[in-house]
């Protein structure tokens, strides 16, 4: 802006905030620095943060317009340069005090990024250098020179995308070498004295003598543009190349600049060369690149494009050119503003990304680790999105991406870039995200095989404290994830500690190594660190082992309790883990937890040693008598494994063998197999003498013959006796007095053995009845012996089940979310809807239970009040035979004969389980109850009858609606069989003043309606279209909706018409058609106005008639599918279409109204199940051409007919499979090709089943009406078209599995014109002269076609 400004001192210095008082779109946020040339601030704008550069105007006459025009032209030129960020706005006089420049705010520049953690690695530096050269190349190709490239003007986003900004074409090109004032004023904004300016820009100070003289003259203005032209000479490309080289050098030397001002001037004169700084660049290719770029001779510097080509495969990996640059550029576009969208796009492309960056799908690093290191660039994109993700799905997708990429990333990236974000996710508000973050963190840390020097204490100081809160998380799934992964976390932490210790020892033992750096030495010695680690993990393990949810404890045991034993050591494994695990067997309600104990105990016992066998023996015995047979199986397997490992003492082995032998006749197959497994392992472990002397006596009662090879499972299984019958076993086990049963069975056995002379029948009638039941189920003497063999097990199991039942009652009463109605004194009532057979009066008894007085009245109303006022307290005595059987509550019957079972009180229920000879329950006679109680029952009965009647009516309506849909016809009046319209014009109607958008015919074919852009809806009488009258006019016109009427549909016959306009209005009109054709009337009934921003205007509509509801379904341009219930004026349903598939253009409804299909502007066809309002399938046209019109196929339920943009294509798609079944192709282009030499499209379609021979009528932009015979395609023809159109033929062929009916123009015959006789005098063309927008048919005495066109014409044909 002229060198003279450098020497002028401003008369007044104002703060940058003061300049914002005159601009209203920007709100001052904070200052970003201030120099004499520019004051820089950050401001808030409705579109985000912006950088505002303020130039204080000292002279109001200063001409700044030319500079503004230059900056605006620069902005236009750089519009497509994705690595350039020019000023978006320039205000030469934003106020009287200043001119301002505006651009988007980016947080970090390259100077700051170099010194910010995590530090850039080598591949990231190369990527940034590559982008710097790319940005310079983009600018130069656009005809723009930067003029001030430096690290402060290279912006770096959070995902390492480079933006070259603050283009300085307004700054002087040349500077005096003997006066640093200009350099300080224009270029040294950071006050670092760093110089990036090309040496040729410093010239002899003599050329500025004239300007200096001007400055001495007080009358000279601040800037004299004419005298400043020498300083504003043309910027050369080589100047930018030099500056870019200095920036790249500073990038690779960790912020050490190549030149300051004095060094650059010396370099210009050949007295200095920055060799010392260049040698700090370790990469030789980068060093050579920088050396070439800072060549003192500008002619020897190449173009940026040449450097990119030269260093391809050298300084810059090939993957930058082939994949990363084009792929990453898509995220710089404005369309990718959402972090969620970026993550979902990367997840979708993950396979392609890994293939390109790694060359294979496996994490091996065989060829070119540099290719896999390109993933670091992608990781920066992922991590930059993590903190701004909104949806749960996106967060889970991001964690999934990290997990896929982690095996291919370096240790530094995993610890410095990935781990902090995973810990961030561990504090997310969504439990699923917290749980998945913990799992991902565990797996990522397990991949680390070496610990960098900076991360020696990462576990005790960062990771474990960062996730400590998850052990007490409110969500069970989070604690579950912690329990699932804590063993691996502890294992990895111990490995980290050992790696650090080993690394420290190796460094200390190296003879040529200096004193070990304190940073690499862990705090204190190894034992202290290990103890601290043990305490941290132990605290969380104990918390999880004491968790209120059993599933957390179970998961901890199943997911690595053995690894925790190894981590803690033998002493703590016994004191901490085993002591807590033992308590799990006290939970009698959750057999899964008890089973998990026996699954895990083997690993713990193996680590603790055989000393634990005395502790475990009673626990294992308890498992063998568990109430749940699955737990018994797991206990047997645990015993077998412990015996194999030698963890059981020999006396204990024999004791267990005696307990387990009876299981050989247990009815459960798994238990028998488990017992056989234990017996065979014991036989294998002990000597042959012990087998026959100590083991065989236990087995003899259960085998059919003596056996030698007991240690072989198959042998032992083959000689086992048949097990006890399951029915007998279960019935005996459920007996309440099982001890008495076994005493009697034992006496019967003694009698059989001869040791007892007589066995009297049992005195207790209960035992007698039980024995009788067992004998009736087939219990033999052999079965009795087997039951006696299982006596000890069955007795213990019976007691265990009884205890479990008692504890379950206690447990349920305090369980969250469970309401104990009995405890509240509330009696449930069940009413039989079928009148039962009357019982004798003496059996019709009603039991009264006194209820708590504080029961809520609302509950009494729902469940019934059984306590009448002033009920007599004295109860009559009942006979002994009135016994209430368990499970069959006493019944109460009202005067109407409705039976009402009444539940017993808790005391009665409890008494029912106590063995008693006469469990008599007192009942209340019905005669005792006062009349108020009967009135309450009568009221309940009335309400019940009303409910039944309501349900019957509802069921009736649903049945009628179902029958209506099942019997639904395609149309009430289909065309007559063999109908083939001749194309004779019957009526030419020109009442509309603008394009007609839609035609609809009423169900009875009495009327048809048209809507137009002229804002009118016209109703026409079909009967008048037969050509018998001289003039044909519409019978009704409605024009009060406003806007352009885009679509309409008839509702419920001919009486209602729904219309929609582009102004968001939807109206339901009533048509009084009963007096046709005399004086019809039309009037609005209902209306609604859609939100144009939220929904947009309606593009298509249809009517659902489901019997119970009359629903008007309409689709809007913004993707809403709404069902408007016309009977209640509310929405029956609302669906939301994903606009990523394109805007909705049309939709069609299945004839049975079970599903609908929408078509979009991007060629997608999406199906929705209307029963559940869920999307079910989506398919897309191969060319993604716009869907013009959709219709259902009249014969095939899953087919839709779609008219698409171009080639007059109409295709029939099977939405169930996604296949294109049939295509009608009225174009000269090759069938099914995606080329479109024919721009014509079908805008209107009509399809009819036509008595099993479906036909299709199409019309569109070529102004022709075509008749397609879908059964015999060769019989298709053009019904009406423009005069002189060539004749056509139709041929059927199969292309790529799709049937195609193609229209082919016949060759014109060459010869005299009179070869073909004329039918009459030359007639005027009767076809349409503009695009046909819709087509329909109606039937009167014959079939008619009605078409409408864009010029407002409606024509009727026959």
Curated annotation (Swiss-Prot):
HEAT repeat ranges per the UniProt record: 413-450, 458-495, 572-610, 612-648
Keyword DNA repair: no
Enzyme class, first EC level, given as a word: transferase
GO CC list: autophagosome; axoneme; ciliary basal body; intercellular bridge; late endosome; phosphatidylinositol 3-kinase complex, class III
GO molecular function: ATP binding; protein serine kinase activity; protein serine/threonine kinase activity
Lipidation (N-myristoyl glycine): 2
Name recorded for this polypeptide: Phosphoinositide 3-kinase regulatory subunit 4
Lineage: Eukaryota, Metazoa, Chordata, Craniata, Vertebrata
